[in-house]
């Protein structure tokens, strides 16, 4: 059985991070089509991702640094109010996207998905930068 620490390290594999970035908006498709089992399948894949990838070869890839930065941010989310605001806005936009998916309003759903992904990539960029600063300055 995989230990939680191993799962965290494997979850920083770049492919794992990029797939997670795509899977959350993909959760809207089952809502659109009214096939909730599809959402359960996507959520299962989401949870199994760390088991599907090896530990990253190094820490030089942007997504690996971003995932490590997210882990640091999670320990002190109130220390970065801008990051917290980005996450809150991103979650709110996904909730709004769920509403538009249920109504099958494609235009507003697409707008919400683009906004969510943009905000989350900005958040990841901040986390990668924070991780780089921490590695440069020391813990």
What are these regions (language model features)?
Residues 19-28, 83-98:
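Core segments of transmembrane alpha-helices
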Residues 104-139:
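Glycine-rich, aromatic-bearing surface loops/beta-hairpins
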Residues 43-50, 88-98, 113-123:
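Hydrophobic core of alpha-helical transmembrane segments in multi-pass integral membrane proteins
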Residues 49-65:
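Membrane-water interface of transmembrane alpha-helices
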Residues 28-41, 97-110:
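Helix-coil boundary and interhelical linker segments in multi-pass alpha-helical membrane proteins
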Residues 4-37:
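Long, highly hydrophobic alpha-helical transmembrane signal-anchor segments
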Residues 38-39, 52-55, 81:
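Structured domain cores in non-transmembrane regions
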Residues 65-85:
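Juxtamembrane helix-capping/reentrant segments at transmembrane boundaries
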